[in-house]
């Protein structure tokens, strides 16, 4: 590895370019440190919204690994890991909120910080039921994660 330093958006672009042609969406890229080891964690979902399998993660990981090796965007040694979004599912686009309609989301941004059920989605606008009051935010202007796990795959 070389001494490049790359921000998460660039790492996300690299991962996206590698896995999107295979039918995957990159939801999130995080650089973490565990016990002195650097880990680049990539959360992916299937574009067809089917459950992510171990085979899917292997296929996405191999494709991205080749691209990360070619571009060498991370300084020093690191481990590239892939996982499905699971209970930590980031909600970054209106369609993510729409898919999880009725479930609770943890929302931060636009002067808000709350956990509430997703009530409605219209365009980029997402409405939540916050203690009986409708609160509408722009999906692209907030950070949100699923706060409860659905009882079935969505």
From Swiss-Prot:
UniProt entry tagged with the keyword Cytoplasm: yes
Location in or out of the cell: Cytoplasm
Keywords: Cytoplasm, Ribosome biogenesis
GO CC term (a single one): cytosol
Cysteine pairings via disulfide bonds: none
SUPFAM superfamilies from the UniProt entry: YhbC-like, N-terminal domain
Highest taxon, organism lineage: Bacteria
Pfam families per UniProt: DUF150_C, RimP_N
Primary location recorded for the protein, binned into one broad class: cytoplasm
InterPro entries: Ribosome_maturation_RimP, RimP_C, RimP_N, RimP_N_sf
Biological-process GO terms, alphabetical: ribosomal small subunit assembly; translation
NCBIfam families on file: PRK14645.1 (NF011239)
Annotated family: Belongs to the RimP family.
Protein name, UniProt field: Ribosome maturation factor RimP
Natural source organism: Deinococcus deserti (strain DSM 17065 / CIP 109153 / LMG 22923 / VCD115)
